[in-house]
Regions:
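Serine-esterase "nucleophile elbow" of acetyl-processing enzymes
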Residues: 3-57, 67-76
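Cell-envelope and extracellular/periplasmic
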Residues: 55-59, 84-85
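Gly/Ser/Thr-rich beta-alpha loop segments that engage phosphate groups in nucleotides
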Residues: 20, 26, 60, 87, ...
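Short, Lys/Arg-enriched, disordered terminal segments
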Residues: 1-13, 105, 200-206
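Alpha-helical cap/lid subdomain in secreted, periplasmic
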Residues: 66-206
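Short loop/turn segments at beta->alpha junctions
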Residues: 60-61, 95
């Protein structure tokens, strides 16, 4: 169930940047059409909201910064979603300092527009991936490093922070595709509901 306290979201222009998690690739299940969580999120909003999803599969954070940040600014959003870092880890290109620099640059730039920014830590992919214990441990440590950066920046800039790492959906295999990395069509619905219910709302009665 989505709890929105009877209010409506106040935003009018929403833009999402990121990788395949936000683009919305994965398996279609239970007759639920495969859509990005972004599409489901907008459908949950009571008010009319224009939106653009610039996320693209396979990109590391540096590429998201170089290819999508300017597009996001041009859209003139009042709400931005930034979820990045999974490919840095999964493609073996993890660099703590480069990741922090790229994320900080994007958040600093977006913050100057006055837009609200929502950011999410990365889920623990290692619970499903068929890797050795040693490789899983390395990946998990890198994911935790990324999440430390995300949480630190979230606190510093007072961002809307969504906690995927500790949410129960991570351990629900019915919500994930056969590649063990991407949500399936049902999973994207749940992701949208989690993000929607995590955001503050405007009380329409006031």
């Amino acid at each position: 169930m989505v709890h929105n306290k009877g209010g409506i979201h106040m935003w009018k222009r929403f833009v999402a940047i990121g990788d395949s998690f936000t683009e919305g690739i994965g398996d279609e299940v239970e007759g639920i059409a495969l859509k990005s969580w972004v599409d489901h999120f907008v459908q949950l909003c009571v008010n009319d909201i224009e939106y653009a999803n610039f996320a693209k599969r396979g990109l590391v954070t540096k590429e998201i910064r170089s290819q999508q940040l300017e597009k996001a600014l041009t859209f003139n959003p009042d709400l931005v979603s930034l979820i990045a870092g999974a490919n840095d880890v999964l493609k073996g290109r993890w660099n703590h300092y480069a990741y922090k620099e790229d994320m900080k640059c994007m958040i600093d730039t977006l913050s100057k527009t006055g837009a609200d920014i929502m950011i999410a830590n990365l889920p623990d992919f290692t619970v499903r991936l068929p890797f050795s214990t040693e490789k899983k441990q390395v990946l998990k440590e890198q994911l935790l490093e990324a999440n430390e950066v995300i949480l630190s920046l979230s606190r510093e800039h007072q961002l809307h922070h969504i906690d995927f790492w500790n949410h129960q959906l991570v351990n629900d295999n019915t919500l994930w595709s056969k590649d063990f990395i991407h949500p399936n069509s049902k999973g994207y619905v749940k992701v949208a509901e989690l993000i929607f219910s995590s955001l503050p709302v405007h009380d329409a009665s006031k």
